[in-house]
């Protein structure tokens, strides 16, 4: 009897793009990426939905393209979320161990106790991530099941979000005929994809610079300790270039991606770049030194906000023994690692997702870190979910027609 294929699917709904990935889970729980779709995102600002219809259309297009490539239809997704409405805090729950030996039921009760906190009425708990356990006086326990004791403490990192903001994201997903089985904070997903266990143990901060937000996650002693979402990202750099160079936004985005340099100290500056004019105005030549000055000012501002956030969190840069890991689209910019090392006075590297099978070569860039981390999270949840249908893929409403979808699939594939 032929074994049923096991699929997982994720949605990374960002300010600049919506990305859908479909993975096939192998017998050894390794993931082959078999479907990829992406669409420009015009219905979000700083990670929050501002236009339901535009967001729905982008999700449909991305999902349709991923389904066509994978030749399967998905019904359930794991979704990444960000936005300046996100809050986080650390909490602790305590329970008596029943029968003197820790069971999963004891752990569940301890986590629920930790979640019994006062939060603003307009916020809801999105996730509670276990940091470690304490059994009686034994600290730093990571796998407590089966251990003997009287009292179980669990320390958790709790993430909350604005109820209406979360509902708007879920509404967009449901209008596409999908169910979101879990919502995961985007910096947690990025950390899952790009960090090593040694970095998490020593102390590290992952900085994911996306289009609309800069997301940070601090790990220490193997667990998440602090998360934050800063409402500033690569789109501000694009707007800075557009205003300073008096060029359309699309042209500014192209210039940022192809010629952008993060620091004025980068070697080889001086190349002349053609900058299109607005409307019928003629284009002109601008030195890459000018671009670097515009871009570095904004990046320095973003890194300054990150430094302040780390200081407020109780995890200043001095405790980050493994340094900084940059990821997200902006982290691919020339000179940004050296610029970050100068500002943070820490070792810095660019983080790309770990290798997977299937379309791995296509997605092993920092732009896909969040989506790959979401795939890992979806894989852990996968056992209890209904599976998608193989074979002919029915088109979702608003998908743009079969020919349009086929054209996008070819563009994504080659």
From Swiss-Prot:
InterPro entries: ATPase_NBD, Cell_div_FtsA, FtsA/MreB, SHS2_FtsA. The keyword Iron-sulfur does not apply. It is found in: Cell inner membrane. One of its GO terms (cellular component) is cell division site. The keyword Cell cycle applies. It is a peripheral membrane protein. It comes from the Bacteria. Self-interacts. Interacts with FtsZ. Cell division protein that is involved in the assembly of the Z ring. May serve as a membrane anchor for the Z ring. Present in outer membrane vesicle formulations which are used as vaccines in human. This is Cell division protein FtsA. It comes from Neisseria meningitidis serogroup B (strain ATCC BAA-335 / MC58).
